[in-house]
UniProtKB/Swiss-Prot annotation:
ATP binds at G113, S114, N115, G116, K117, T118, T119. Pathway: Cell wall biogenesis; peptidoglycan biosynthesis. The gene is murD. It holds the Pfam family Mur_ligase_M. It catalyses: UDP-N-acetyl-alpha-D-muramoyl-L-alanine + D-glutamate + ATP = UDP-N-acetyl-alpha-D-muramoyl-L-alanyl-D-glutamate + ADP + phosphate + H(+). This is UDP-N-acetylmuramoylalanine--D-glutamate ligase. It comes from Coxiella burnetii (strain RSA 493 / Nine Mile phase I).
Length: 442
């Protein structure tokens, strides 16, 4: 195999397999490696590509040296020593989003942020459909982007993570946004500023930047070519909240669009998501009637502050997607404001090096007991033990049982871990499903 044209795919999960399929269809020579002995897609891969070199259980420096280009799966860090060495030598290191961007010509709406990106991506996709457009919603949500190139839709709505943006260079979007920033993935970034810089890449070749007026530190120093469209709860913004006839309403440049009571989800973070989706939809020229219709009907996404059931006048919420401090803080604040009683929080898992101290004030205000699970339970306990009652559980079943014992009528039991799930579960969906099944069995 000629190394002049060899591409090496690093990582063989869903993304890596989609890259292999894409390159094979283009007759591009490639090889694959994964540091895991049994990566998720290896059996599929060897059945489909028995003659393609696959290295498992380690990374091969020899093979990386032979590569003209390296495609890095988002789960593999650019700081991985052998990868960092290749980058230092000037080797082209890209991800699947870059491969996608090189091969599509349809308009793209691109969305990132620490919290809310899956919800906003989903809502903008629904707005497109309501306007009669053929849309593909993909990226860090749903199917890999390379599987969405054919047949080509009218529009792409992409959810993008910081890891995906780090290895993307050719993305041109009609509109792009960073919804918000809070500490996440600090096991992959030296500082919050490094994490923000990765996110800011989304604006690089964007026609209409969409910005959060409540977090100007994200965007104020960026050299935009066009005036941004803004959204915000607390500051003057194009899409904002306004008082009208003694009701809080969503407004666009001062014009009242709808009272927030018409929304099924109207806690603060839901309103921020709605305002961001309206700004993105406006940039994509979606009629306002279609957008408002979608917002009125939208009732949320599984594992994102999802109501599970009421049992003995206690409400149970599954926010397993709350994998970072910012998401859990937002969930506590919004449910705490709405609760008749207090919150019992189930939290813990793999903290990813995060600082848990931003949870202190909302826990003090709304949470009467925290049930801790998982690897970084001791770190959470150290942060919160002076503020509220702390209990530990060895399993989700035990956590639900303890939280139910601690709750009384009017209280809310909230699973919002502020941590990744991989120490105890396959992923955050699995964690949320186990919580939901346990609650439904009460």
């Amino acid at each position: 195999m000629s190394s002049e044209s060899l591409t090496v795919i690093v990582g063989l999960g869903k993304t890596g397999l989609s890259c292999a399929q894409f390159l094979a269809a283009k007759n591009q020579p490639f090889a694959v490696m994964d540091s895991r002995e049994e990566p998720p897609e290896w059996e599929n891969f060897i059945k489909t590509y028995p003659r393609v070199e696959l290295i498992r259980g380690q990374f091969s420096e020899k093979l990386l040296n032979e590569a003209q280009e390296i495609i890095l799966s988002p789960g593999v860090s650019l700081q991985e020593p052998l990868i960092a060495k290749q980058a230092a030598q000037g080797k082209s290191i890209i991800g699947d989003i870059e491969l996608f961007a090189r091969n599509v010509n349809k308009p793209i709406i691109a969305i990132t942020g620490s919290n809310g990106k899956t919800t906003v991506t989903t809502v903008v996709g629904l707005m497109m459909k309501a306007a009669g457009r053929n849309v593909s919603v993909c990226g860090n949500i749903g199917e890999p982007v390379l599987e969405q190139i054919t047949p080509e839709p009218d529009y792409y709505v992409l959810e993008l993570s910081s890891f995906q943006l780090e290895t993307t260079f050719s993305l041109r979007s009609q509109a792009a946004t960073i919804l918000n920033i809070s500490e996440d993935h600090m096991n992959r970034y030296a500082t919050l500023q490094d994490y923000l810089r990765a996110k800011q890449r989304i604006y690089t070749d964007c026609f209409i930047p969409i910005v959060n007026a409540d977090e100007p530190e994200i965007w104020r120093h960026l050299p935009f070519n066009k005036k941004p469209l803004s959204f915000g709860l607390n500051n003057a913004a194009d899409f904002s909240l306004a008082e009208h006839n003694q009701k809080t309403s969503i407004a666009y440049q001062g014009k009242i669009l709808m009272p927030i009571q018409e929304l099924k989800l109207n806690a603060r973070h839901h309103l921020q998501n709605a305002l961001a989706a309206l700004a993105l939809g406006t940039a994509a020229k979606i009629p306002i009637e279609n957008m408002l219709h979608v917002l009125r009907d939208f009732s949320g996404i599984r594992h994102r502050c999802q109501w599970v059931r009421k049992y003995k006048e206690i409400d149970y919420y599954n926010d397993s997607k709350g994998t970072n401090v910012g998401a859990t803080r937002a969930a506590i604040e919004s449910l705490g404001q709405a609760a008749k009683g207090q919150l019992i929080l189930i939290a813990g898992g793999q903290g990813k090096g995060a600082d848990f101290s931003p949870l202190k004030d909302v826990v003090k205000r709304y949470v009467k007991q925290v049930i801790l699970i998982g690897e970084d339970a001791p770190l959470l306990e150290k942060t919160l033990k002076e503020i509220t009652v702390i209990k530990h559980a060895d399993s989700m079943n035990e956590a639900v049982k303890r939280s139910t014992q601690a709750a009384k009528a009017g209280d809310i039991v909230l699973l919002s871990p502020a941590c990744a799930s991989f120490d105890m579960f396959t992923n955050y969906e699995h964690r949320g499903d186990v919580f939901t099944e346990t609650v439904e069995a009460l």
